[in-house]
Amino acid sequence: VSQPTVASAIRAALLTADPRAKAMAARQVARDWRLGRLAFRFDVPVPDRPARPETPELLPPNRMPKRGKGGSERSRIALWHALAHIEFVAIDLALDMAGRFGAEMDEIFVGDFLSIAADEGDAFRPAGAQA
């Protein structure tokens, strides 16, 4: 039985559209890497774009409502929502770095970026729970 590769695990996480499932997948990839369950092989390409949920529609910042300074409940909810989006994108960025450049770098580089992805996944949970 061949060991799953770090590249295939990263690719699967990047192709996960649901934000909470992606956060869990990032934590699982990092855990599997730490425990030696993933081979240091880059046998599948990183997707050109990570998967995104169908809704909500992503809009450019200039088309989004102003968040205010967090004084009102509505403003605080908007702020938590924005933070959740930032964490979601940060998961993808860290996974992409590990998958796209890991073969040219080393295991420490991959481990560092998988750790970042897991940390962002952990941070996504409370932010996502607030939105």
Positions of predicted regions on the chain:
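Non-heme di-metal
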Residues: 1-131
